[in-house]
Amino acid sequence: MGLATAPLGWTYVAWFGQIPLWIWIFRANTTRLNFTQLKQFLISRSLTAIAWGGGFYGVALFWITGVHPLTWLGVPWLASLAIAAFCWLAITAWGVVLVFVWLLAMAVWEVTTARTKVNSTFKKYLFILWGTASWCGLETLWSHSILWWSPVAYTQSPSQLHFLQWGAIGGPALLSAFIVAVNGFLALGLIDFLDGKTVNKNKQNWHYFLIAILIWLFCQGGGWLLYQKPLADTPEEKINVGIIQGNIPNQIKFNSEGWQRAIAGYTEGYKKLTEQGAEIVLTPEGALPYLWETVVAKSGFYQAILQTQVPVWLGAYGTKGDGYTNSLLTVDGQGKLLGRYDKFKLVPLGEYIPLSNVFGQLIQRLSPLKEQLLPGDRPQVLPTPFGPAAVVICYESAFPDLLRSQLLQGGEFILSSANNAHYSDTMAAQHHALDVMRAIEGDRWLARATNTGLSAIINPRGKTLWLSAMNQYEIHAAPIYRRRGLILYSRWGDWVVFLLLVVSAIAWLYQIVFPLNQR
């Protein structure tokens, strides 16, 4: 399953990558589970979750080890290796826990519905319904935690744009639901084919496969129809945005060499973009990694703003009480702060330490600041000269509900600002894939500026109109458009999850009400 994710992008693997997990569930007989078997039950589920979860989350998220070496932060080489390994194991384990809880939920369904007179084939349909609903429910729950990146849905991004259009209807949960259900029916068909238990073998063997194919055709065909809807943007809503990809390595980012290189690169890029007609310029997360007051007092970049009088979205740090924030600032053409967005979803261990009273002395922080960063408030939108903007800073791209809350507050376009220099090219490709999904779900234009790549312009159908190279200094100017309407997912959020769970609950009660008293 991990092979389906960007940048490798073997997206078709996702449509059968969950089959082994489904087959294991169908083969495991939990209908007569008792307490004496509980230990073996938990062990078998744990091992299965580790095997499948490790193959998906462990492979897809292996890029996290790219933080090593951290010697540029003064961390010894071996300690840096230990930190990288711990981060990878932690995020993989969190995914494994999701799979384990799902396996428990499936077992609970089997045990509680074992004594029923419901037709066995229909019972299997209901079981797949529950599997789909519970998986989507768990992914949604996990997406509200502090640690999230990898829904099953993102295996289809950025290449499968027709299928991804369903995100505008039901968000990532609907995409995951299609994939999980298809895997479930394919698994049933494969089991039935191998067992060959029925009298009318050919008919029985193929109807599960047929259902899986019909679901796949429906979501692909329906997505194609959604993709054909014209954008209908008007010239009055156009904003000419300039993007600067600074390409400042982390190894020098926070010393005098990095400061001088950043000032020179961003100032030169800013001036060139204004000459090309950019009405506002977007910079990456932490483009100038200091407080705004320092930027004003000590940088030629600020003087360039005063000279050209073209506003800028600047990645810098802000203050909040006695702490600091990772912020994107709107600076108008007179050099005044017009607005500020403070990053809400901070990176665990990198920007703050969860349960710092317990673990603060055990784990070295990856942040260069002397203090932990503080989260911003929610919801926020960023005031700009062109209307309110929805913003995601780096890690926040993985949290669709965070962006949706900003659209509900009036966000008319999306700004994505990231560093990405900490990690490998794999992370940059997956980050871009997530932003493609966010643009579709929000029905908004998205401008994306990163330090080392991949920077991009993405339209509301998820089409990438421009994509930068990796690890190169680049500037680019392109139009985006303001949009104000709210589509189904933006307005109603995870209604698909709620609907699936309600229907599953009704199906469960139906089976409980009709126990197996005659057969």
From Swiss-Prot:
Cystine crosslinks: none
Known pathway: Protein modification; lipoprotein biosynthesis (N-acyl transfer)
Entry GO CC: plasma membrane
Subcellular location: Cell inner membrane
Domain of life: Bacteria
Keywords on record: Acyltransferase, Cell inner membrane, Cell membrane, Membrane, Transferase, Transmembrane, Transmembrane helix
Membrane topology summary: Multi-pass membrane protein
Alphabetical list of Gene3D superfamilies matching this protein: Carbon-nitrogen hydrolase
Pfam families registered for this protein in UniProt: CN_hydrolase (PF00795), LNT_N (PF20154)
Known function: Catalyzes the phospholipid dependent N-acylation of the N-terminal cysteine of apolipoprotein, the last step in lipoprotein maturation.
Protein family according to the UniProt entry: Belongs to the CN hydrolase family. Apolipoprotein N-acyltransferase subfamily.
NCBIfam families named in the record: lnt
Name of the protein: Apolipoprotein N-acyltransferase
